[in-house]
Amino acid sequence: MTAILVTGYRSFELGIFSEKDKRVAIIKKAIKRDLIAYLEEGVDWFIFTGNLGFEQWALEVANDLKKTYPLKTATIFAFETHGSTWNDRNQQHLQQFRATDFVKYSYPSYESPKQLKSYHHFLIHNTDGAYLFYDSEHETRLSYLVAAMKEQPCYPLSFLNFERLNDIADE
C-alpha cells in the first residue's frame, strides 16, 4: 500500500473565491495529470487534511478518477471542530471530505501548538510522500509542514507550482 499526502494553498490564499474562476480548471487539469501519474506508479491512497482550495479540488479529481482507477481517499483532520464556522457552501465541501473512504480526527479541539506539531509528525510518518501545491516564494502557514517534510530523509515531495500552471494555461 502506498499513501500520498495531498495538500497545498487554500482558495483564499490564491485569491480564488468562486468555483467558476478559470484558474480552478487549470489547477484541476494539473492535478488530474499528477494523480494519474501517481496511480500508474502504484499509489492506492490519497490522504487529505480537509482544507478548501487545492485539497478540495484534488479530492474532486480523485473522486472522478475512482470511476477508472482502484484508489482510496482518506481525510485526517487535525481537530473535530475543523470547518465548524464555515458558511453553508463550504459546509458542502466539508461533507465531501467527511465522505472519503477513511476519516479520522487527531484531537477534539485546539489547545496548543504542540498538537499541530504532533499532527504534522503523524501525517508525515504515516504517508509515503507528499504532493503539494506550494511555492516557497509565496509562503503561508503550510511552510511549517513543508519544513517538517524536508527534514525527513527518503520522504519524496512533488510540487505543483505557479510556473507549471502557467505552462498548462498556455497549452
From Swiss-Prot:
Coiled-coil region list: none
UniProt xrefs under InterPro entries: YspA
Top-rank taxon, per record: Bacteria
Family matches, as Pfam families: YpsA
PANTHER family per record: UPF0398 PROTEIN SPR0331 (PTHR38440:SF1), UPF0398 PROTEIN YPSA (PTHR38440)
HAMAP family the record matches: UPF0398
Similarity-based family: Belongs to the UPF0398 family.
Protein name per Swiss-Prot or TrEMBL: UPF0398 protein Sez_1569
